[in-house]
Amino acid sequence: MRIFLDTANIEHIRHGVRLGVVTGVTTNPSLVSREGKVDYQKVVKEICSVVHGPVSTEVLGEDVQTMVAEAREIAKWAENIVVKIPASLEGVEATSVLASENIKVNLTLCFTLNQALLGAAAGATFVSPFVGRLDDIGEDGMKVVTDIVEYLDYYQLPTQVIAASIRHPQHCSTAAKIGAHIATVPYEVLLQMIRHPLTDIGIGRFRDDWKRVMGERGILS
């Protein structure tokens, strides 16, 4: 399973890339605005220059014509752009139009297998079930991800699943176990995935044992 960052923070993206684990980004106008940015296109282009994998960014339009027009323009910003289209009736139709033009689509705000099924049929490159938001209303977000993965696998469809609205590391590990192709995570969750108190304790013990014998001398000293 690949890891994407769900953010518009350039420094967080740079750090994820330096770690060697982040291979894509998902973002939207809300995430860009949280960073105090006003030039949406400039921010997205900068992200695309930092990450060489897919960068999903969202349209604002709600009708088919506007979504398609915005998507065509956004797709020109960089070669690794993927356009996020909402899983609405209009969004599915827009996805079909864009897929016929070889514009990659991430069907976002997906909450059911049926939405993902239609998105895949329309030619979406990715579908993004929102795990945390489903959990928030008492539904089982990971069950929806499981159903979508099983459906796509059974029919050998090329559409990939991005587990989105990830709230904690357990969401990510569960997504990996059930076969999601990608999990897009907030920067804070990425850091939580790496950290464990027993790792910190072990590092401290190794350091203390070394100092007892070798003092302050390092391995390369």
Q: Predicted regions: what is each one?
A:
Residues 2-14, 19-22, 26-97, 131:
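Active-site beta->alpha loop and helix N-cap motifs at the rims of alpha/beta catalytic domains
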Residues 20-24, 77-80, 97-106, 121-128, ...:
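Glycine-enriched alpha-helix->loop->beta-strand junction motifs that scaffold or abut catalytic
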Residues 41-55, 92-105, 141-161, 205-220:
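Alpha-helix-loop-beta-strand connector modules within alpha/beta enzyme cores
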Residues 29-32, 109, 125-137, 179-199:
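Glycine-rich phosphate-binding active-site loops on the catalytic face of alpha/beta enzymes
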Residues 28, 83, 119, 175, ...:
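Conserved, mostly hydrophobic/aromatic
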Residues 109-144, 151:
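Histidine/lysine/aspartate-rich catalytic loop segments that bind and position anionic ligands
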Residues 11-19, 66-70, 94, 112-122, ...:
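Catalytic cores of alpha/beta
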Residues 152-221:
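C-terminal alpha-helical cap/extension of soluble enzyme domains
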